[in-house]
Regions:
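Flexible coil/turn and secondary-structure edge motifs
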Residues: 1-159
């Protein structure tokens, strides 16, 4: 249907954050903290990152979220560079969650249902490659769950 899944994250890469203030204003968590042993992280691109981020706040077990750009060719691009389509970045939300409180399947359900993955490079009135549907993962266990959820949701779309 569409290319949405790439393993681009490493331990040294994450969504860029403001270098002077790391406290999440809504969740009151440090957005620069690395996941602890009972936590995991994933990055979702599902349209405008502000609206997408808000969807994940209401899920119990989500520790923190942060927004930024991923999947592009330039370090620390500006909003205008990303909107130009030249850098190849997507607007994304990094989600860190407690694996003992919420399963990745619940996060994937929110991902599929909080946007329309069938609209290529747009969400509603927002148009551009930065609004594409994408998932960045860190391990093969999550990769398998992501692909399984994609197949399940694709079957529903074809009914």
């Amino acid at each position: 249907m569409f290319e949405f899944l790439k393993n681009l994250m490493t331990n040294n890469e994450s969504v860029s954050a403001n270098e002077t203030n790391f406290l999440h204003r809504i969740l009151n968590t440090d957005i620069k903290d690395e996941p602890k042993s009972q936590e995991d992280e994933i990055i979702f691109g599902c349209g405008c990152f502000w609206g997408a981020e808000k969807c994940f706040w209401k899920l119990p077990g989500v520790i923190t979220t942060s927004v930024g750009y991923a999947g592009g060719e330039k370090d620390n691009p500006t909003y205008y560079e990303v909107c130009s389509g030249i850098t190849g970045h997507a607007e994304v939300v990094k989600v860190i969650w407690n694996v003992n409180e919420i399963d990745i399947s619940d996060l994937l359900k929110m991902f599929w249902e909080c946007h329309n993955p069938t609209q290529k490079n747009r969400q509603g009135n927002d148009m551009g490659t930065q609004y594409r549907s994408t998932i960045y993962y860190k391990n093969d266990i999550n990769k398998d769950k992501i692909y399984s959820s994609k197949e399940a949701y694709q079957k529903e779309l074809y009914k």
